[in-house]
Amino acid sequence: MSGSQTLVVKLGTSVLTGGSRRLNRAHIVELVRQCAQQHAAGHRIVIVTSGAIAAGREHLGYPELPATIATKQLLAAVGQSRLIQLWEQLFSIYGIHVGQMLLTRADMEDRERFLNARDTMRALLDNNIVPVINENDAVATAEIKVGDNDNLSALAAILADADKLLLLTDQAGLFTADPRNNPDAELIREVTGINDALRSIAGDSVSGLGTGGMSTKLQAADVACRAGIDVVIAAGSKPGVIGDVIADISVGTRFHALDTPLESRKHWIFGAPPAGEITVDDGALSAILERGSSLLPKGIRTVEGNFSRGEVIRVRSLAGRDVAHAVTRYNSDALRLIAGHHSQQIAEILGYEYGPVAIHRDDMIIN
């Protein structure tokens, strides 16, 4: 790929600490140098940084605290300011300004908030400012869980309209088996599609400070590739790794973007976590998959969760297959009332209607 590129670089806690209990500043200095070099060459760089909790623990002198959500939030609140201060200090050596964006998955659930975040991201990039993004761990609750910053980096790549997403980790890439305990494990260089076989060989990282593993990196790669973004998983310790990815030099494991990526509007649908789910019968399933039809209330069997009109929900088959992510035209209570009924009965049952379909085909992404 020639010309100016937009690259999102995700740095996990294991990369930032080198497996220790404190931030490895020498290594972070080197990564900033690589980013600054590419920035000077005209490329747009976005940083997705982990490490707030580790930075907070270090700043407080490694206190003995209970392993609770509240403790993680406390450490994140203390560490986040230390972390952004470090990024700001190091990038300033090269005359580069940074802009902090603290996000949660909730910022991706609402269309307006998604667009606002996208506008902020693009404004920073247009003004040659490096966005530094992290999960807002100090206020997030359910979001503090395995894989948040992996998945967050894929969503950041969508917000930035990135060309590539680089997931830096403590492993050289994705292997055929866990290289820590299998000497015959081989590095997988190229991936053109993520399937169940690939997911089954993804192992978890050994770091006790972070929240990510290889399986969540596959999830992130899947989201980004479907949005038309190439993804590379590589070792953060490899010299010149950021420049290699920009230059398309083979490094780590590369996941190729789909030839027919999701349209811009559907990026948000695919990235948003489902607020609930519905199960459809075989007739509706066939209409959706084979004819590209909208979903009518008649084909709905069950409704799970409580969600509002306009939220993203999951569509499942009777066999339990995850069929699609979609924006619902009706809330969960309304869907329970009209499920199994003909479209002509909607107004009679509800006293109002938003049209004859429960989900329009343009608001649906088939998995």
From Swiss-Prot:
It is found in: Cytoplasm. InterPro entries: AceGlu_kinase-like_sf (IPR036393), Asp/Glu/Uridylate_kinase (IPR001048), G5K_ProB (IPR041739), Glu/AcGlu_kinase (IPR001057), Glu_5kinase (IPR011529), Glu_5kinase/COase_Synthase (IPR005715), Glutamate_5-kinase_CS (IPR019797), PUA (IPR002478). Substrate binds at S50, D137, N149. The keyword Cytoplasm applies. Gene3D superfamilies: Acetylglutamate kinase-like, PUA domain. ATP binds at K10, T169, D170, T211, G212, G213, M214, S215, T216, K217. GO terms for molecular function: ATP binding; glutamate 5-kinase activity; RNA binding. CDD domains: AAK_G5K_ProB (cd04242), PUA_G5K (cd21157). GO terms for cellular component: cytosol. The keyword Amino-acid biosynthesis applies. One of its GO terms (biological process) is L-proline biosynthetic process. Keywords: Amino-acid biosynthesis, ATP-binding, Cytoplasm, Kinase, Nucleotide-binding, Proline biosynthesis, Transferase. Its EC number is 2.7.2.11. It is an enzyme of class 2 (transferase). It comes from the Bacteria. It catalyses: L-glutamate + ATP = L-glutamyl 5-phosphate + ADP. Its main location: cytoplasm. HAMAP family: ProB. Belongs to the glutamate 5-kinase family. Catalyzes the transfer of a phosphate group to glutamate to form L-glutamate 5-phosphate. This is Glutamate 5-kinase. It comes from Pectobacterium atrosepticum (strain SCRI 1043 / ATCC BAA-672).
